[in-house]
Amino acid sequence: MSAHIEHQTRLLIENRWDEGKAAAMSPQELLLYRSHLLGADKRVTNFGGGNTSAKVRMADPLTGGEVEVLWVKGSGGDLGTMGLDGFATLYLEKLLSLRSGYRGPEDEDRMVGLYPHCTFNLNARAPSIDTPLHGLIDRPHVDHMHPDAVIAIAAASDSRELTRQVWGGEVGWLPWLRPGFELALRLGEFVRQHPDAKGVLLEAHGLFTWGNTSQQCYRNTLEVINRAIAWLAGKNAGNPGLGRQRHASLPAPRRREVAAALMPRIRGLISTPARKVGHFDDSEAVLQFVGSEHCERLAAIGTSCPDHFLRTKIRPLLLPYDAERDSLEALTARLPAAIDKYRGEYGAYYERCRRPGSPAQRDAHPVVYLIPSVGMITFAADKATARIAAEFYVNAINVMREAEGVSSYRGLPEQEAFDIEYWALEEAKLRRLPPPRPLAGRVA
């Protein structure tokens, strides 16, 4: 085996389905098992991202007759750690009947308000906006994932052609469309027209796959992702996709020293209106990105996948720093002006894109701070959320690097990004979050 092929093999995601363990499981338990396997690997989907579903025949508590019930991951929660109570359950027939009343894309918010009327057995778990995407795909088992390798192809400027090159006719392609009922209708139509397809790539978004059994669905999901991983590894061998390295990384102790000096200073500048906690990441992927000649250009384009920028804001703040010439004091002194500039640009973005009825502008401070030669700092309401934001931006880095290696990376149009960030449904989700704990945002 050549060294390159051996490297490719190490990159692939292992099929961890245990037939013996799965043999005694109910359909619902198999769905949960599949969800845990998929959610355990961040190459498959990020924390809290993606969703899974199964269509299960069950006794109707109202009539005693048998009905088909859509079990689908509900709003919030994480695939890798959720329990059965994390699934929303809906009468499939009622959900499908909503097609007759759908009036077009302007009707999306109203449709979401109708999903609770389809609830089976008084389940309190709120359905997510992806619910109809699962329901209208006429397959028993469906996965929706955000794998870095697949999103790299989805975010490439020639995404449709690359999809054909990677998967042939096994995986289809649909142009960007905001998640909702319109996209669900298009997915359903695609499946009807391509009965032999294993899945479909959604431009600038992610992947849908399906199967006739839970195990087959899991296997198809891994096969589609692994095909992308292997194809990108072959195409990008020896090609970092980020250009030459412009800034060499500092030694690890010095990186930590710089981060330790910056973090309390940044925290003091951004902890109004709410206190925040920071996280530092100097992993290899981050150091390669912040040191590359294309970092400034790519960071300015912004992230593409909605799951990414909802956690990280559309763009990071890249701090100007030349470790060979600049002192730490000089870098620290630049922070107030750099953060003020970012806040002004974010406010201008809000004013350019706001619509009548848009929610009020949110906190304009950066979430992600990139420092050449040093790494990345993220700030959020608590340590866990700051760490997760860093994980999401590493996902975005992986996408940009791989897309640039085979094509050119393309972010979402600014208005599309704004319409998701300030979507009334996202605002409602934020309002459902529990209030901060008394010591949230504080450090000891």
Where are these regions (language model features)?
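Glycine-rich flexible loops
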Residues: 1-444
